Amino acid sequence: MSMQSHHVHLVSDATGETVSNVVRACLAQFEDVRVVQHRWWLLRSPSQVGRVIEGIQRDPGTVVFTVVDPEIRRALEEACRLINIPCVALLDPVMDALALVLETKGNQQPGRQYTLDEGYFSRIEAMHFALALDDGQSLDRLKQAEVVVVGVSRTSKTPTCMFLANKGIRAANVPLVPGIDPPAELMDLAGPLVVGLTRDPKSLSDMRRSRLRLMREDGDSPYAEEDSVAREVREARRLYARMGWTVIDVTRKSIEEVAATIMQKLGTAPWGEGL
């Protein structure tokens, strides 16, 4: 018996990133359901609402929107009311609470979070930095980093640094290679936060085997052999302990969770701020 499809319409006056992320987080809590998402972005005039409503009528389902323009909102909500479709204003509870506390109304301007402000250019600079100092490159610039991520192969060093860079944090990463001493630039480093990533040896071995298969190489090489991997992990952890570096086990953590932990250590994302 085939699973019934449920339709959800995501409507935004900007890129749709906010409503997409929130709905994705909510849907993750529901198992064994099939949801078809319909995306309607850059809704900037009441005349565009008709096209959206036509799509909703074709595939009826809950509407979740982030639209700030009052006229467009009214047109969308009224159209949904007439066809008896639930219509959820995603940001209203937060905006109302903030307006009450701040004793002022927010600017009703779509996409304000995407303006080319200082934060935007800081993120671009951080992305260039992370790319330039990826995988042990440009070690002479290591002291310019805010955080240096260290780990054996396949411990998510690069994606973690790229995620941090997207938050405007200058992040570099240095690989630990069996049989090769860590670079002096890393060992003599003073100033930046150094974070050592580790992973369960069995999980790490499985990941490396998968990588080798994708590359059509021998999956039984020492690179992926579990005992060899376990030795690598032990040696890395000994190094972390000797150097007093922060250690994060990434075995059951997403990239976002690892980055959030690092940001907490940096002090750039205390409780009440964040990703």
Curated annotation (Swiss-Prot):
Q: Its Gene Ontology molecular function terms? A: ADP binding; ATP binding; phosphotransferase activity, phosphate group as acceptor; protein serine/threonine kinase activity
Give the EC number(s) listed in the UniProt record. Answer: 2.7.11.32, 2.7.4.27
Annotated Pfam families: Kinase-PPPase
What does the record give as the reaction this protein catalyses?
Answer: N(tele)-phospho-L-histidyl/L-threonyl-[pyruvate, phosphate dikinase] + ADP = N(tele)-phospho-L-histidyl/O-phospho-L-threonyl-[pyruvate, phosphate dikinase] + AMP + H(+); N(tele)-phospho-L-histidyl/O-phospho-L-threonyl-[pyruvate, phosphate dikinase] + phosphate + H(+) = N(tele)-phospho-L-histidyl/L-threonyl-[pyruvate, phosphate dikinase] + diphosphate
Q: Which InterPro entries match?
A: Kinase-pyrophosphorylase, PPDK_reg
At the top level of its lineage, which domain of life is listed?
Bacteria
According to its UniProt record, this protein's enzyme class is transferase
- Keywords assigned: Kinase, Nucleotide-binding, Serine/threonine-protein kinase, Transferase
- Check the UniProt entry and state the signal peptide residues, or none: none
Q: Where does ADP bind?
A: 151-158
Please name the PANTHER family in this protein's record.
PYRUVATE, PHOSPHATE DIKINASE REGULATORY PROTEIN 1, CHLOROPLASTIC (PTHR31756:SF3)
Q: Which family does it belong to?
A: Belongs to the pyruvate, phosphate/water dikinase regulatory protein family. PDRP subfamily.
Q: What is its biological role?
A: Bifunctional serine/threonine kinase and phosphorylase involved in the regulation of the pyruvate, phosphate dikinase (PPDK) by catalyzing its phosphorylation/dephosphorylation.
Put simply, this protein is called Putative pyruvate, phosphate dikinase regulatory protein
Source organism of this protein record: Rhodospirillum rubrum (strain ATCC 11170 / ATH 1.1.1 / DSM 467 / LMG 4362 / NCIMB 8255 / S1)
